[in-house]
Structure formats: C-alpha cells, structure tokens
C-alpha cells in the first residue's frame, strides 16, 4: 500500500495461466496484445508486422488462421518471432489442431462454433499435447441464436451466460488453462458484461472494446472502457482494437496502463496545452521529443511546461523537467531544467531539445545500470 492511497488499485484475484512465456492472471502484470492485419500466408509481411508490434512493446500477438494455408504458414512465422503467438480460430476445429501443432502459444476459439463435443475434445487434446492455452472469445455481434431469442438482444446477461457455458465445455474436458473475453463495440455493454463476469468466475479476463473505431475515436472509447475496468481492478490482459496499425494499438494500450500506474514503459511526458505565457513552442517541442525519445524503453517521466505557473510543481514530480523562462516573444530568455525534481540549470530555446534528449538518455542509462547491478547481486545474496 502506498502513501498516496488514492492511487492504489486493488486487482481482482484471478487464476494464472501461461501464454507461451507470458503469464496472464494472478499476480502477473497486465499484458498488452495486438493482432496482425496482414495475410497470414504472406509470411514475410506478417513477421515484419509482428516485429514492429514487439518493438512497440507487445507482449502477445494474435494471428488469424481462417484456412489450412494460414495454419501451414504459422510454423514459419512463429520460428521468426520472439513474442507468443495466439491463433485466431473460428468454425474449423482442424485449424485449431493444426495451429497447436505449429507451435501457437494460445488458441482463440469459441467452443460453441467449433462443432460437436468430440471435436472440442480433439481440440483440447491438441492443446494439452502442445502446451497451448485458450481464450474463450464472446462477442456481442455473434451471440448464439438461442441466447438472442431468450434475451431479445445482446445484453450483459446473455454475454456472461455464453462465456460461462463455453467455460463449462472446457472444464468438462478437464481443461482450465484459458482466459475469457466478452467484447462489444458498445462500451457500456462491454463494461457491464465484464463486471458481471468478474463476479461470476475467477478465470483471467482479456479486456477489449471491439471494433472501437479509428485511431482517435477508438483510442478515446478504449481508454474509457478498458481504463474504467482496470481502475476497478478488473482485467489481466488487454487489446485495444483500432482501425490502425498493430503497433499503434500497443502504444495506446501502454498509455492506458501507464495512466493507471499498472505498467511503465518508455518516457511518460507531462506537458501543458500551452498559452500566451509559454516561453517556447510547447506543442512543437513535445511532438519532436516524443519522436526522438520513442526508442527509450526504460520508464522515465519528463515534464514540459511552458511557464512558471505550474512548471516548477510538475517538475518536482518528474525525473527530468523543463519550465519556460519567459514570454515566447522575449529573446534570450532561459528555461529552467530540473533533474530528479530539483532545479539544476538553465538552457536557451535553441539548444533545449538536443539537451533534453541527452539528459533523458543519460537518465535511462543510469536506471538500467542500477537495475543490472541489482539483478547481478541477487544470486550472490541468495547464496549467502
């Protein structure tokens, strides 16, 4: 428990499963997923896209396997990437078996559309034989006909009933290495369904607002939907669904987690919207800095505030801070640089971007060195 208890999030207690090398649920960090949008049969393009997603921080990547040619390509894809791969399967139970044999870490299936009980048993057998976990993926847009007839429309009750009935199918086959999602494009519906499901079971939950929209609108909708659930302690892994490239989904996912102090990766910029008091062009400065610092993976906070109204206060709370020294029209004004929350020196507008990049890179190197030293000391401490 921290001193600032208003920041604490009490996460729902869930079971822990493995998706390849990544743990999901239990005390594991909330993982970030995305999905490729290339033709899976185009191995080179799919591998390149997965690698870009991985560079952005993706923990897990899903790949669609609609046909035999796609599952045939899966083995070559998996051999060339480092992140665990989830095979997205619908309707064809043989695709699930083929994906497991190809090395998929997880099978995203809907047991209700895989086929007969015997076919489900075959899929479970393949998953067990090859160390695959599964995701039961319920979607408001594809609920079973009988549930729509029972409830009249997609609703939280129908989605939870679908999820739990599918969970029982796997449980009846002595398989519990699975997570569940109950997605909808309506954030209200999705949140209500996830909250009800969280009360009804202890399986890890994969969060998402499906078909959320384009980069801007989808980001806002996902931040509200996924963010509100995470804030309530619900959720073990997330996928931000955007009509955008997979790496953009990953970046948005991490921004949501960073905002809630659940995961930290890279530079978190605190910046003002700017006004007539700004001592430098805040908007342009932030844009350039975010681009030039995108390679940093070490968690660091950087405040960029255009004037002294809020600048010093924000700088005290960040690793590196910059506060504008006067009106933009005032030539020769010097801006104050803060290091570890303490006023350290001044810098002019012309040199400040290069200077801040150097400071952040130096700070990142220091943090990385300390972490490496700590890890190197752990075995020696344990041996003593």
Swiss-Prot record:
Q: Which InterPro entries match?
A: Dihydropteroate_synth-like_sf, IspG_bac, IspG_bac-typ, NO2/SO3_Rdtase_4Fe4S_sf
Q: Binding of [4Fe-4S] cluster: at which residues? A: 272, 275, 307, 314
Root EC class: oxidoreductase
Functional note = Converts 2C-methyl-D-erythritol 2,4-cyclodiphosphate (ME-2,4cPP) into 1-hydroxy-2-methyl-2-(E)-butenyl 4-diphosphate.
Q: Give the top-rank taxon of the lineage listed in the UniProt record for this protein.
A: Bacteria
Q: Which NCBIfam families match?
A: ispG_gcpE, PRK00366.1
Q: Which organism is it from?
A: Rhodospirillum rubrum (strain ATCC 11170 / ATH 1.1.1 / DSM 467 / LMG 4362 / NCIMB 8255 / S1)
| Reaction catalysed by this enzyme | (2E)-4-hydroxy-3-methylbut-2-enyl diphosphate + oxidized [flavodoxin] + H2O + 2 H(+) = 2-C-methyl-D-erythritol 2,4-cyclic diphosphate + reduced [flavodoxin]
Q: Is rRNA-binding set as a keyword in this record?
A: no
UniProt keyword 4Fe-4S present: yes
Cofactor binding note of this UniProt entry? Binds 1 [4Fe-4S] cluster.
Q: Single GO molecular-function term?
A: 4 iron, 4 sulfur cluster binding
Name-wise, this protein is: 4-hydroxy-3-methylbut-2-en-1-yl diphosphate synthase (flavodoxin)
A GO biological-process term:
isopentenyl diphosphate biosynthetic process, methylerythritol 4-phosphate pathway
Give one Pfam hit by family name: GcpE
For this UniProt record, the keywords arranged alphabetically read as follows: 4Fe-4S, Iron, Iron-sulfur, Isoprene biosynthesis, Metal-binding, Oxidoreductase
Q: Which cofactors does the annotated protein need, by name? A: [4Fe-4S] cluster
Q: Which family does it belong to?
A: Belongs to the IspG family.
Q: Which gene encodes it?
A: ispG
